[in-house]
Amino acid sequence: MIWVAVVITMLLFILVAKPTGIYLEKAFQGSKKLDKVFGPFEKLIFKITGVKGYNQTWKQYALSLVLLNGFMIVVVYFIFRLQGVLPLNPAHIEGMEPTLAFNTAISFMADTNLQHYSGENGLSYLSQLIGITFLMFAAPATTLAIVMAFIRGLAGKELGNFFVDFTRALTRVFLPIAFIAALVFVALGVPQTLDGAVTAQTIDGAKQSILRGPVASFVSIKELGNNGGGFFGANSTHPFENPGQMSNILQMMLMMLLPTALPFTYGRMVGNKKQGRILFVSLFMVFLLGFITITTSELHGNPVLNGMGIEHVQGSTEGKEVRFGTVFSSLYATVTTAAETGAVNTMHDTLTPIGGLVPLVNMMLNTVYGGVGAGFVNIIMYAIIAVFISGLMVGRTPEFLGKKIEGKEMKLIAVTILFHPLLILGFSALALSTSLGTDAISHSGFHGLTQVVYEYTSSAANNGSGFEGLGDNTPFWNITTGLVMFLGRYFSLITMLAVAASLKEKTVVPETVGTFRTDNGLFGGIFIGTIVIVGALTFFPMLVLGPIAEFLTLK
């Protein structure tokens, strides 16, 4: 029965992807019906803010993005620092420590939601609502705006206006869908209140303080926007965030909704729907392989316990919630790292070595399917590399969407693709070379190495999940992961926007018999191979020293 539920869940992922992709294309490219519904409200916003809506160059678009996001980071930083004297603080929580406030503000603006604090006792309701939830809408709206400009550039059109795209992402996508999802979560038992904690009497007569808050509205945008941060420290393992299997499936659907839709949006906007389908199917195969790997490992159980003759038919249940079980915990772990959300319904630090390797690889690739917007930019980056390599092998100038890929584009892509591993491995080496980093490690040996690398991988990929055995709420970890999140977020977005702007100016080369097609199975296979060879092999030495070595040791 459990496998039937898994198949149905995956079919739902597939069935909603195309309709959502069509809706996104209409939402951003203009639709009379949508303009009639949302237009008056958007015009009011533009009038108040003074947005003119003129087309921007890629530099103007990028500058608008950085300035708006930077302003939001500063505002939210001071909210966190001053929450102790601000209203909506029934628990009388004090202001955040400076480096933690720095880390948290960047974390949520970068759509990472790395949390070095426990939500229920680290933030006031005001900080949760005005600080955290606000950024949970603003961060994915930023990247969705960027990806629309990126696709327009690839299609040879004007990039558009950042502020118009940002507003449309909020009004036409995130606000309406999150509102509906929040109502469903309330119906499923997720609390939504501004009241303080309630005191309950336990079975043995003791008194217990049960924390609550505006959780349903928080969870809906947490999953839809691929944010992933928890209202509670336990994240989606907490029964108030994720009461049962229905809420669990809904959360996974929300996480996958936009990342799986974007290939179809792309196909429609560039006039090659088949290429969008090829990208979707290719990535789903990689996703499926990851799920099968982690599930097989977790169901097989802990090799040490197996060697002792201890029977555990449910597999490795350490760190997992009984109400979800091993299979759905494995699926959730695959989804949350494939969609770069970072929400967890099981503790990733307790996964088996190979089970923990799958989320780690998903984040290292940062492209299966990746988070809202940013992940799709990486997908096209790998697609262009696949075309470039194929062109070199046959001695032909590579073309993508009928436009020649030349030195300028490949230099930008080369720098972008190297920057991701440089952040992860460079900062991991720094942490391992100083006691400021190693003192946080709770496990010696191979697993300790994986804890460190996982933290920086999660930060660079804007995921936010963690091997929570790491004691990371220290100035060193707060500052270094904050820098990695910021650089990992904005560097690739800006460089790939420059690539799109460069391709926009090029004339379309007529298709000939020798043109390498990017809308068939051959390209899909080369695309997957490029992701594995260029992406995964970059990190292979580290994977051997970490989870693979731990697996062989346990064996």
UniProtKB/Swiss-Prot annotation:
Pfam families: KdpA. GO terms for cellular component: plasma membrane. It is found in: Cell membrane. The chain crosses the membrane at residues 2-22, 60-80, 130-150, 173-193, 246-266, 278-298, 374-394, 412-432, 483-503, 525-545. InterPro entries: KdpA. It is a multi-pass membrane protein. Keywords: Cell membrane, Ion transport, Membrane, Potassium, Potassium transport, Transmembrane, Transmembrane helix, Transport. One of its GO terms (molecular function) is P-type potassium transmembrane transporter activity. Its main location: membrane. The system is composed of three essential subunits: KdpA, KdpB and KdpC. Part of the high-affinity ATP-driven potassium transport (or Kdp) system, which catalyzes the hydrolysis of ATP coupled with the electrogenic transport of potassium into the cytoplasm. This subunit binds the extracellular potassium ions and delivers the ions to the membrane domain of KdpB through an intramembrane tunnel. NCBIfam families: kdpA. Belongs to the KdpA family. This is Potassium-transporting ATPase potassium-binding subunit. The gene is kdpA.
